[in-house]
Amino acid sequence: LESHLVDLPGGVWIDPCAGTGRIPRTVNAYRRDVRWILCEIDERHRETLSTIARPGDVLLPFGDFVHREWRHPVADVLIMNPPFSHALNFVRAAFERAAVVAMLQRSTWIAPARASFLRDHMPDVYALPKRPSFTSDGGTDATEYAWFVWPDGLKRRFGRTAMLDLPRQRNLFEASS
């Protein structure tokens, strides 16, 4: 997310589906003002996530983010790339746990199946002009992606739309000056 489009504050950030830690690793490379609460359902990622955590970060016991009892204060940012079929449940849970919610998801996430939710919770949408790779070999699929950002909480009927300009953009997680 270009820093001139979205100003993601420092502080406590949650990644509720941390997986192999790609989002926290990328953020940590550009920002020192973020402390993490990392959550993952798949225990196979425990060792990888423990190497990413810095002093002050919290690695939650492995389990389901959406249904777990939440005992932490509201975070500054919740940033995620949840499974497509569960994304709406993740977003709803995220609203209760963070001030700003940012989700990387297929562009088709804005669709009639979620119309009743989106009528009252319209995100800002930042389309990626290039397909991201989610594989170790750098390959991509035939799917377009976008960042969906709810910058100010729950209820709103309109959001902004922008195309990220990759050749000129600052890193998507770089703190704005």
Annotate the PLM regions:
Residues 1-177:
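Class I S-adenosyl-L-methionine-dependent methyltransferase catalytic core
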